[in-house]
C-alpha cells in the first residue's frame, strides 16, 4: 500500500512524497545467529534480528526502496561516494541507492574479516576480502541495473545489503516512519 503526493507546475521540477505501508500480517523478524564469530557475537548487547522487514506496529515500512523507472536524465554523477559500512557484522545501510559511475566507499568498522561480494545482473561482480586491518576499499558500477540487487558477505551468511544502481538520482529509501521524498523530478516524467 502506497500513498503518494505529486506536486509540480509545468515549469518547475516536481517532488514525489509518499508513505510505504505493508498491507497484511507482518512477518516475524528472524533472530540472527552470530555466535560462530566471537567478534560478531560480542558486538551486540542483545539478540540481533534480521532487517529484511523493518516496520512499525502499524505496518509503516522502514528502508523500503522507492525509485522511478524510464527517466531521461542528463545531469552528472554525484562527486560524493555512496558509503557502505560493516558494523557489528551487519551492513549499514541495509538498503541504499547510488548512480552508475558513482564511487562506492566500503568500510570495515569491525575487528574481523569480511568478504564483500556483489551480485549485479548487468555489471561485473566484485568479490574481495577485507581483513580486519583493511578499513576502506573503493568500488563502482559502470552501468545502471534494471532492479535492486544484493551485496553479501561470504564469511557471514546473514550479512546482506540491497542496492539500486540507477542512471538517474530519482530514488529514495523510506525513513523509520515509512516516509520518503524524491525531489527535483523533471516535468513530464
Locate each region found by the language model.
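Bacterial N-terminal signal peptides
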Residues: 1-9
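Extracytoplasmic copper-binding redox domains, predominantly the cupredoxin/blue-copper superfamily
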Residues: 11-189
Amino acid at each position: 500500500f502506497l500513498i503518494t503526493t505529486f506536486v509540480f507546475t509545468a515549469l518547475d521540477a516536481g517532488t514525489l512524497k509518499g508513505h510505504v505501508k505493508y498491507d497484511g500480517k507482518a512477518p516475524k523478524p528472524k533472530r540472527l545467529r552470530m555466535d560462530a564469530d566471537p567478534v560478531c557475537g560480542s558486538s551486540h548487547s542483545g539478540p540481533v534480528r534480521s532487517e529484511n522487514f523493518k516496520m512499525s506496529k502499524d505496518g509503516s515500512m522502514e528502508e523500503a526502496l522507492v525509485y522511478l523507472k524510464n527517466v531521461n536524465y542528463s545531469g552528472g554523477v554525484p562527486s560524493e561516494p555512496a558509503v557502505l559500512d560493516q558494523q557489528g557484522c551487519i551492513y549499514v545501510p541495509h538498503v541504499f541507492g547510488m548512480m552508475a559511475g558513482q564511487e562506492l566507499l566500503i568500510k570495515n568498522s569491525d575487528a574481523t574479516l569480511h568478504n564483500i561480494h556483489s551480485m549485479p545482473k548487468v555489471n561485473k561482480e566484485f568479490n574481495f576480502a577485507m581483513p580486519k586491518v583493511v578499513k576502506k576499499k573503493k568500488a563502482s558500477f559502470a552501468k545502471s541495473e534494471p532492479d535492486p540487487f544484493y551485496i553479501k558477505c561470504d564469511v557471514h551468511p546473514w550479512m546482506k545489503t540491497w542496492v539500486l544502481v540507477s542512471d538517474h538520482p530519482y530514488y529514495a529509501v523510506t525513513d523509520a516512519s515509512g516516509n520518503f521524498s524524491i525531489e527535483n523530478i523533471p516535468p513530464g516524467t
